[in-house]
Regions:
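Active-site neighborhoods of divalent-metal-dependent phosphate/nucleic-acid chemistry enzymes
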Residues: 73-118
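Extended, non-globular alpha-helical segments
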Residues: 63-67, 74-77
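Short, well-structured N-terminal submotif of metal-dependent ribonuclease cores
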Residues: 1-45, 54-65, 91-92, 96
């Protein structure tokens, strides 16, 4: 049995499931999402993604949570270790100081053993 690609998805992927103003991104995202629904990928979602979704306005927020409910995913939470790694990414110049959220996503994906981050 072939190992599934383990992907960490960021908020923008879920958001682009309903993006009529960006039909190209929406079409690409829908194709990817279909693979997630059929189990082609092992999907990982970080707690920062959930927090970002909570900040969205209705009806978009409900739509995105409903979409997440249609795929299997592993939820990973921010830990002291992920904070430390995110700080190192920024401290070493891998990301700008204002890139704290991106660093958090990357650190979580790293600790979760993801093969790719999809954004």
């Amino acid at each position: 049995m072939e190992k599934k690609l383990r992907v960490y998805i960021e908020t923008s992927i879920i958001s682009h499931l309903d993006a009529p103003d960006r039909p190209d991104r929406m079409a690409d995202t829908l194709r990817l999402w279909k693979g997630m629904q059929t189990g082609e990928y092992a999907v990982v979602v970080g707690s920062p993604v959930m927090a970002e979704l909570e900040q969205c306005h209705e009806p978009k927020r409900s739509f995105m949570f409903e979409a997440l409910g249609k795929i299997e995913y592993e939820l990973v939470s921010v830990t002291n270790e992920s904070r430390r790694i995110a700080g190192e990414y920024i401290g070493l110049g891998g990301l700008p100081r204002k890139g704290g959220t991106d660093a958090a996503h990357i650190a979580l994906a790293t600790l979760a053993g993801c093969d790719a981050i999809v954004s």
